[in-house]
UniProtKB/Swiss-Prot annotation:
It comes from Sphingomonas sp. Residues 1-21 form the signal peptide. Its cofactor is Zn(2+). GO terms for molecular function: metal ion binding; metallopeptidase activity; peptidase activity; zinc ion binding. Inhibited by the metal chelators EDTA and 1,10-phenanthroline. This is Microcystinase C. Belongs to the peptidase M81 family. Zn(2+) binds at D167, H169, H191. The gene is mlrC. The keyword 4Fe-4S does not apply. The lineage of its organism: Bacteria, Pseudomonadati, Pseudomonadota, Alphaproteobacteria, Sphingomonadales. Pfam families: DUF1485 (PF07364), MlrC_C (PF07171). One of its GO terms (biological process) is proteolysis. NCBIfam families: micro_ase_MlrC (NF041767). Involved in peptidolytic degradation of cyclic heptapeptide hepatotoxin microcystin (MC). Cleaves both linear MC and the tetrapeptide degradation product of MC. Cleaves the Adda-Glu peptide bond of linear MC heptapeptides. InterPro entries: MlrC, MlrC_C, MlrC_N.
Amino acid sequence: MLDRRTLMGGILSMAGSKATGAALPGRRLRVFVATLGTETNSFSPLPTGLDAFRATMLWRPGEHPDFATEATGPLWAARERAREGRYEVIEGTCAFAMPGGPVSAQAYQLLRDEILDQLRRAMPVDIVAFGLHGAMLAFGEDECEADLLERARAIVGPDVALGAELDLHAHLSQRLVRAADVLVAFKYYPHIDYVERARDLLDLLERIRAGEIMPTSSLFNCQMVAGLATQSSPMKELVADLFEFERRGEVLSGSLIQGFRAGDVARMGSKVLIYTNNDQPAAASIAQDFGRRYQAMASIMKGNGPERSFAADIELAKAATAYPVILVDSSDNPGGGASGDNMALARAMLDNDLVPSCIGPIWDPLAVQLGFEAGLGADFSLRVGGKVGEASGLPLDVRGKITGLAENVTQNLQGSRPPLGRVVCISTAGLDIIVSEIRDQCYGPDMFRALGVEPANKRYVAVKSSEQWRIGFGDMGRSVIYVASSQQSSIRHYHKRSRPMWPFEPV
């Protein structure tokens, strides 16, 4: 059966067609933008309901603050063009939750339908652009993004240009690709390019609406899942080559989707998505070429071959001679849906005299409350962490001093300010433990500095993160050691993911 793009081919090539209406001189494009997303960890004990969205992002039309966020790049880019007189922007709800467990059916349906009702009221429009993540799962719906896009298409019809920006840790499927005219994912990890990719998305949607291009896609399944930083070789060169294909015009858009291994769904995995201008054989060939190169490099990259034991990680840290050493507790990263309250690394730092040092953020609202009750300077016994679930492990009983208290602490994330709420620093035996009221990962040193702790003066700096910490720390660390404190991979039991998939099975 011919898909919508094939049927549109004749229409797009006709002079004076309806699609060319977007290019009429003097007319601003009517553009609807909204956001709905989270990154769902199927194994997280943390429920994701409406309160989780309220705690992170639940901005109704007109409430989006005057800065860009990872989740709302399309809205920000559309506002830029509205200021230039090019767009009439109709803003929908922007909703995003800190990664956790599956979204409740009630929360997902309420937010989805709220956005779709806003779209109905906005009609007629020329363009619909969503900020999505790509790895959002809800009870009763394993493909939230495709579901939203399909329902949006039913509202706007075939002639409106419809697309979305995705995180590169998305789960891609043919259903999701078919649901949009074009999908554009971040190219960098850490995620530093969400505004640029949102601009790319809008450029493509404008050209689609004007009838200038007909994106034709190919999706290559790498049969693996590998999270690779893009600032170092060989991934750096692969991304650069993809940009070069786009610059030359051979590719309209290309996305290297790394996938998210904590999502237990059939579509989970690393994939390559390529769009060409009505040239499917070329799209398939280019997607396969990049996919094969990605497969070849994965096994030599961090975190994708045989993992060191936690004990070996600590021995490696003890052997360091250049400081500070950044200890990255990626297995307990709140940015991947973990609780952020596993204390194994903090305990090991104390037991092995890895001091002077600091660690954070540890998520423990009760410990924060008790720390504020005790007050600044108090000598205090406090049980920290180990509260949420099996992966949290044992709590750490700390006898120390409250050396820092701060309210309304935020972190700088490329201009946006994700909150940590009230934060406590408890110092014991040379280790400064940063405990936060709101769960989030570490994006940089300002989290420590808000409590009077200077990471540059420490021998060891332990962060609850995976790669996003690099945004703020830059090259502060003389060496970087990735540790696996919670051993979460050992307690994951997949039921839905495809098989075989490397590194779980040989391919």
